[in-house]
A protein has these predicted regions:
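SF2 helicase catalytic motif II
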Residues: 48-52, 58-102
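Interdomain hinge/linker at the junction between the two RecA-like core domains of SF2 helicases
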Residues: 108-154
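Conserved strand-helix element at the start of the C-terminal RecA-like helicase core
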Residues: 1-8, 45-49, 148-178, 183-185
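Conserved SF2 helicase motif VI
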Residues: 244-269
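Conserved Walker A/P-loop ATP-binding site and its immediately adjacent core
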Residues: 1-27, 49-51, 111-114, 166-168
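Conserved helicase ATPase core of P-loop NTP-dependent helicases/translocases
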Residues: 185, 191-219
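Conserved two-lobed SF2 helicase motor
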Residues: 38-58, 211-227
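A short beta-strand element within the Helicase C-terminal
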Residues: 229-242
Length: 348
């Protein structure tokens, strides 16, 4: 994401690595200028999925064949699945990815990808030869606010980091706990604007820098993966989920939690997860969910086929309406092709 790319490009460790961060404000001409200026150097593009088209366009305008000139690495590849339900652009470069002569995906928390184009890929698993287990104190509660108050009150640490994927809930926690003046929030640009201009909370940033930290530091999901948080101290780490108030605050113990703990390169002092739970949740197996998607797909393809065969306006209108309301639409990309990432996200 943007914040991770900005941090990498501004990290003194990468001063001589000839990096270019291709994000929203960087245009095709900027990329072309960088390529031409890097004639005797390796080019290293750090690109968001949404800005990948700029790199592609730059190579085309320079009459260079990107797919053989470059190696493509999709870092934090689990995001292809985890973010597919709300970030359509996350898998925009995927069709291009398979055209590269050299290509790979990497993640510390890889998820199974059902796209058949991955079937011939070799999978390399790196397993540490040392124990990397971390103790996590699970606090199950029916009142996440009150439990949060108790947790921060009992902490003796001068640095507390809280991961919670809802800026509205973050603000409510800060306000009701009375820690607004001691807090900083790291979140997306849109949320920064809301906090600063609608809620008059000034310590909100889209880019992480240690000097901006206060005693209480809140992070949304854009900071769950890919970023190095290097501190001189070992903070107390609080992960918070409130599934009844905001469902997208739910944390996956097999990916989100591992990624969050892994952000802190110098370790943490204490880890806790404050959470409640669904009261009416019905478990379904992976096979049951895939069968549901399969039936949606069969029905969608049948309607589309009938639309192609329809010759009168009434039938065509009816079939178009049925296509527009098909549940399978949530599993289509912007070209109306099946998105395996969206299917994997639904299963996950």
């Amino acid at each position: 994401n943007v914040s991770t790319i900005q941090c990498k490009c501004n990290d003194p460790k990468h001063t001589h690595d000839n990096l270019i961060g291709v994000i929203d404000k960087v245009g095709v001409d900027d990329v072309k200028e960088y390529i031409l200026a890097s004639k005797d150097k390796y080019c290293k593009f750090l690109v968001t999925p949404e800005s990948f088209h700029k790199v592609k366009k730059a190579f085309e305008e320079l009459d260079m064949y990107m797919y053989s000139e470059c190696f493509m690495l999709i870092d934090e590849s689990h995001k292809l699945v985890k973010d597919a339900d709300y970030r359509e652009g996350i898998y925009l470069p995927l069709d291009d990815f398979f055209q590269f002569k050299g290509k790979a995906l990497v993640s510390a928390t890889p998820l199974e990808l059902s796209d058949p184009r991955f079937n011939d890929f070799q999978r390399l698993v790196i397993e540490p030869q040392f124990s990397y287990d971390k103790d996590i104190h699970i606090q199950y509660t029916n009142n996440t606010l009150e439990r949060f108050k108790v947790t921060v009150r009992d902490s003796k640490n001068d640095c507390i980091c809280v991961f919670l994927n809802s800026t509205d809930t973050i603000y409510a926690l800060m306000e009701k706990t009375g820690i607004l003046e001691e807090s900083t929030v790291f979140c997306a640009n849109k949320s920064v604007r809301k906090l600063k201009y609608s809620l008059n909370f000034k310590n909100a940033y889209s880019r992480f820098e240690p000097k901006r930290m206060r005693k209480f530091n809140f992070f949304t999901s854009r900071f769950y993966a890919g970023m190095d948080i290097e501190l001189e101290c070992k903070p107390d780490l609080i992960m918070l989920s409130d599934v009844n108030l905001v469902e997208h605050t739910v944390l996956d113990p097999y990916s989100d939690m591992i990624q969050i703990v892994g952000r802190f390169r110098n370790g943490v002092n204490y880890i806790t997860h404050i959470t409640n739970t669904f009261t009416d949740y019905t478990y379904r197996s992976k096979e049951e969910v895939l069968r549901e998607v399969e039936i949606y797909e069969i029905n969608y393809n049948f309607i589309r086929r009938e639309l192609g065969n329809a010759i009168d306006n009434g039938s065509q209108c009816a079939f178009r309406t049925l296509l527009k309301t098909s549940p399978f639409n949530q599993f289509l990309d912007r070209h109306n092709n099946k998105s395996y990432c969206a299917v994997d996200n639904y299963v996950d």
